[in-house]
């Protein structure tokens, strides 16, 4: 689905953890890293497309994130001809994107790269918000800069510690705050700490595969 100017509507996702680090995914079978993104289907709103892509690419559900902000307008980039399939050259010009800034509300092990039969990434990592843009494929750098800059004003909004494995009813939620035997609270806290440790170990194992210090650029078009 292209607009009259030849741009495909698309959403981009900048996912933050509690330390304001951002999620980077490694393209499957490649040595290139990028933010999650994907096209908006006919009849979808940008927000609906964002939640669909979030699940398809990294396995997260709406309850695992909070929307912190989004870009006011479409951000566009043109794709060089060498990256465009021959059959659509002359019609397809590039992408126009609405970017969402999300805050992780779940745990690292809620991220699943094989949530669908057609995974986009085979590894992931958290990285500093202002990762050098030399690491991004050249024709997308301006859009990344615009999105990161516009959304940076939201960085301290809704900053929080990730949810415990008990949600709002665990040792760090309603029940933990408002009473219960001390011994039970301590026991639940110990269980939560162990669950978080197991989760972090699982997530660390998932990110160990070929993770560079910073994402590196790719020579392949990432216009999906």
Curated annotation (Swiss-Prot):
Q: Which UniProt keywords apply?
A: Hydrolase
**Which EC class heads this enzyme's classification?**
hydrolase
Could you tell me which residue ranges the Nudix hydrolase domain spans?
6-149
The catalytic activity of this protein is classed by the Enzyme Commission as: 3.6.1.-
Q: Keyword Chloroplast: yes or no?
A: no
**Cofactor field:** a divalent metal cation
Q: Which InterPro entries match?
A: Nudix_hydrolase, NUDIX_hydrolase-like_dom_sf, NUDIX_hydrolase_CS, NUDIX_hydrolase_dom, RppH
For this chain, the family text in UniProt reads: Belongs to the Nudix hydrolase family. RppH subfamily.
Q: Which NCBIfam families match?
A: PRK00714.1-2 (NF001935), PRK00714.1-4 (NF001937), PRK00714.1-5 (NF001938)
Identify the residue span(s) of motif Nudix box: 38-59
Protein known as: RNA pyrophosphohydrolase
Keyword Hydrolase tagged: yes
Which species is the source of this protein? Cupriavidus necator (strain ATCC 17699 / DSM 428 / KCTC 22496 / NCIMB 10442 / H16 / Stanier 337) (Ralstonia eutropha)
Polar residues compositional bias, start-end: 214-224
PANTHER family per UniProt: ADP-RIBOSE PYROPHOSPHATASE, DIHYDRONEOPTERIN TRIPHOSPHATE DIPHOSPHATASE
Q: Could you tell me what this protein does? A: Accelerates the degradation of transcripts by removing pyrophosphate from the 5'-end of triphosphorylated RNA, leading to a more labile monophosphorylated state that can stimulate subsequent ribonuclease cleavage.
Q: Spell out the residue ranges making up region: Disordered.
A: 165-224
GO MF annotation terms: pyrophosphatase activity
Q: What is the lineage of its organism?
A: Bacteria, Pseudomonadati, Pseudomonadota, Betaproteobacteria, Burkholderiales
Q: Where is the composition biased (Low complexity)?
A: 181-204
